[in-house]
Amino acid sequence: MAMVDEPLYPIAVLIDELKNDDIQLRLNSIRRLSTIARALGEERTRKELIPFLSENSDDDDEVLLAMAEELGVFIPFVGGIEFAHVLLPPLESLCTVEETCVREKAVESLCKIGSQMKENDLVESFVPLVKRLAGGEWFAARVSACGIFHVAYQGCTDVLKTELRATYSQLCKDDMPMVRRAAASNLGKFATTVESTFLIAEIMTMFDDLTKDDQDSVRLLAVEGCAALGKLLEPQDCVARILPVIVNFSQDKSWRVRYMVANQLYELCEAVGPDCTRTDLVPAYVRLLRDNEAEVRIAAAGKVTKFCRLLNPELAIQHILPCVKELSSDSSQHVRSALASVIMGMAPILGKDSTIEHLLPIFLSLLKDEFPDVRLNIISKLDQVNQVIGIDLLSQSLLPAIVELAEDRHWRVRLAIIEYVPLLASQLGIGFFDDKLGALCMQWLQDKVYSIREAAANNLKRLAEEFGPEWAMQHLVPQVLDMVNNPHYLHRMMVLRAISLMAPVMGSEITCSKFLPVVVEASKDRVPNIKFNVAKLLQSLIPIVDQSVVDKTIRQCLVDLSEDPDVDVRYFANQALNSIDGSTAAQS
């Protein structure tokens, strides 16, 4: 092969690979752009590589997406901020492609580059780019333009700023709904850069146009603008211009707009302040909680606790609580589930007496809901109620339902109960645990779902830590060891798992007197899976018991297992023997 000029070689490889039929090769070369740019040097990168990329904007979307991302961090490879403008042409091309994710990444990269450019470069290169995109024939260019106005605006002259505001206003009235959507979506960002004198006169006029758009997809994006613009306006302007829009949107004919209001309600309340929230937004929120569209009720129900934090307890009880009671028996399981995921947080807001009077009956009905996710959401947040009403009342009112759920037909509900048991046990005390929950813990060890059995074994360890080895020796160990003769090998295996977890908590004496004989006996089991788990368990017991026990009992058992016909049993037995030899060598 003829000698190739070394600096030319990387660009030649890149060009070859970019034209290759294999998309993976083209992708790899794009992702190596920074390496190639280093090899070429800054000047050749500017003069050869970037123009080449500008001409290649008709590739697969995956390649173009990678290119858009790479160019966003390319300033150091073209000679620094002084030459950042050379990166604009390829990104401008990418802003006009059909694929949305490519355009969005190109816009993101343009924002990164534009925010670092010098003011004169912004005026000479970036602003003309924005204008070209905003005046583009193809709607994709105009959509992309909306996302970069806020970067262009900051470093402009007053004349250019006036021009940019007028151009943005035109985009808000564009014939294409996609462009108006982009204008609505980015209005908040643009507004943060616009001087306060133009907020009411110009930006709010654009906003008003968008809120009255005949397309619900534009109006729902204007909802997000309410919160963003509300933070920029003076309080009195916010009440005069934003509040009526929110109230109207909460009654919009499109459920998607109402859904967006419900979803953004907390942010909207922050924008208009506490007084308007109490007088104007409480009725709006109540309407959303009682909306005839389930999707809207789901969004509203999920915000009930956050919304109540903005109110005093009396208002919450008077206006919101009746809706919460209705939602707890809503015809949609998803509404009930959304409510269950947040309702426990209302307890600290309402206080002990109101929680007992109003919320406990709702908790109880949700705990007995036919839909497992509803029950699950309540169980996972029980500690929030416990902190408010105390454990005694909790045990009297909710615990019977919790115990019932311990045998729920859905394993995820049983799992949630298991994970809650150590907390319950620590707060209720030993006596209550022995009466109500002890038998359940053993029952879970023999559950037909592995995740439940594993969680139950971990549970035993946590209970032993909570109540101490003596209690565990009396109430847990005998029941666990009784299972060693269970006809099902998976349940026998669970005994080994429970021993491995409990042994470090129980200490050397109980491990040697109670656990070890059972483990040695299990080494003679007919099932290979049991035997190699015995080998692994014996290895984990080495640090817990005395060296004499290791030499006398554990080693001999492992030697027997190392001669087992099953290859896995022999492997784990030898691993354990090596571990013994290693620890012996370290001690000597």
Swiss-Prot record:
Its main location: cytoplasm. It is found in: Cytoplasm, Cytosol; Nucleus. Ubiquitinated. CHIP-mediated ubiquitination enhances phosphatase activity after an abiotic stress such as low temperature or darkness. Keywords: Abscisic acid signaling pathway, Auxin signaling pathway, Cytoplasm, Ethylene signaling pathway, Nucleus, Plant defense, Repeat, Ubl conjugation. Mostly expressed in cell-dividing tissues such as apical meristems. Ubiquitous, with higher levels in roots and flowers (at protein level). GO terms for cellular component: cytosol; nucleus; plant-type cell wall; plasma membrane; protein phosphatase type 2A complex. Pfam families: HEAT, PPP2R1A-like_HEAT. Gene3D superfamilies: Leucine-rich Repeat Variant (1.25.10.10). SUPFAM superfamilies: ARM repeat. GO terms for biological process: abscisic acid-activated signaling pathway; auxin polar transport; auxin-activated signaling pathway; defense response; ethylene-activated signaling pathway; positive regulation of abscisic acid-activated signaling pathway; regulation of stomatal movement; response to ethylene. HEAT repeats lie at residues 2-42, 44-80, 81-119, 158-196, 197-235, 236-274, 275-313, 315-352, 353-391, 393-430, 432-469, 470-508, 509-547, 549-586. The keyword Ubl conjugation applies. The keyword Lipid biosynthesis does not apply. InterPro entries: ARM-like, ARM-type_fold, HEAT, HEAT_type_2, PP2A/SF3B1-like_HEAT, PP2A_Regulatory_Subunit_A. GO terms for molecular function: salicylic acid binding. Each HEAT repeat appears to consist of two alpha helices joined by a hydrophilic region, the intrarepeat loop. The repeat units may be arranged laterally to form a rod-like structure. Belongs to the phosphatase 2A regulatory subunit A family. PP2A consists of a common heterodimeric core enzyme, composed of a 36 kDa catalytic subunit (subunit C) and a 65 kDa constant regulatory subunit (subunit A), that associates with a variety of regulatory subunits such as subunits B (the R2/B/PR55/B55, R3/B''/PR72/PR130/PR59 and R5/B'/B56 families) and the regulatory subunits TON2. Interacts with CYP20-1/ROC7. Also interacts with phosphatidic acid (PA), a lipid signaling molecule. Interacts with CHIP. Interacts with SIC/RON3. The A subunit of protein phosphatase 2A serves as a scaffolding molecule to coordinate the assembly of the catalytic subunit and a variable regulatory B subunit. Seems to act as a positive regulator of PP2A catalytic activity. Confers resistance to phosphatase inhibitors such as okadaic acid and cantharidin. Involved during developmental process such as seedling and floral developments, root gravitropism, and stomatal opening regulation. This is Serine/threonine-protein phosphatase 2A 65 kDa regulatory subunit A alpha isoform. It comes from Arabidopsis thaliana.
